[in-house]
Amino acid sequence: MKRLPAVAGSFYESDPKKLKMQIEWSFRHNIGPRDIPKQTYEKKKRDNLFFVVPHAGYIYSGPVAAHSYYYLVSEGRPDVVIILGPNHTGLGSYVSAWPKGEWETPLGSVKIDEEILMQLVKESEVIDLDEKSHLYEHSIEVQLPFLQYFFDDDFKIVPIVIMMQTLEIAEFLADAIYNVMQKNPDKDIVVLASSDMNHYDPHEITVKKDVEAIEKIQQLDYKGLYEVVEGKDVTLCGYGPIMVNLILAKKFGKKAYILKHATSGDTSGPKDSVVGYLAARFGS
């Protein structure tokens, strides 16, 4: 079973050469890390296990996303990347994993780690195997070219989209991922929470709203983040995936490090209506 790209040519370049140039542009951008990370091939224990990455078009959020990937790549190639994204389309189940096969982008194909996926399904009891949720969803797809640029097809993924972003679902998923990571100590597993921040307010208002959410992220306060999103009109689309990583970070004794916060007004133009973007890592 192969999942074909849904947003190549719109969110990112469909031509492989242009796409690689777009990724390099993201790293070298003045909002980005301004450098392309050097890969290490030495196998050592990874410090940064969990990340927040944005998922807009690369011209908007690519430079911010590059900050998270800089740290991920610098610690070597992971065996498995669990990618948690929100469900923007409304299709499919409340929590949906692509069941098997591979995902294709202009840079090639990446296989699903079916063994880790089935362990997660068994542990969580809330994950459905459902490809419908993923067919047109961009939040996971846009992460793959960044990973493929550095690791080619030498890693596997577990793509999970979350429509029901509740505290209970976040707790169930975090417990399941924690248990699976504990049962597979020889596998280098990384978890990405794919999310943009506040949407379509003027730049100053978006920054103010985002800062409230970022404070909760820094404190690993997933319940506080939920309250900010639900109670203060912060239109943060992937708070469910972020909550999962906040719970996991606390379980693993990690701290939150904010790598970059910016808006689409910073990266590509008008500031009257912007989207916020955050890159964060969770490590020692």
Curated annotation (Swiss-Prot):
Organism domain of life: Archaea
Disulfide bonds: none
Listed Gene3D superfamilies: LigB-like
Pfam family, one: Memo
InterPro entries tied to this protein: MEMO1_fam (IPR002737)
NCBIfam families: AmmeMemoSam_B
Similarity comment text for this entry: Belongs to the MEMO1 family.
Protein name as annotated: MEMO1 family protein LS215_2219
Organism: Saccharolobus islandicus (strain L.S.2.15 / Lassen #1) (Sulfolobus islandicus)
Taxonomy of the source species: Archaea, Thermoproteota, Thermoprotei, Sulfolobales, Sulfolobaceae
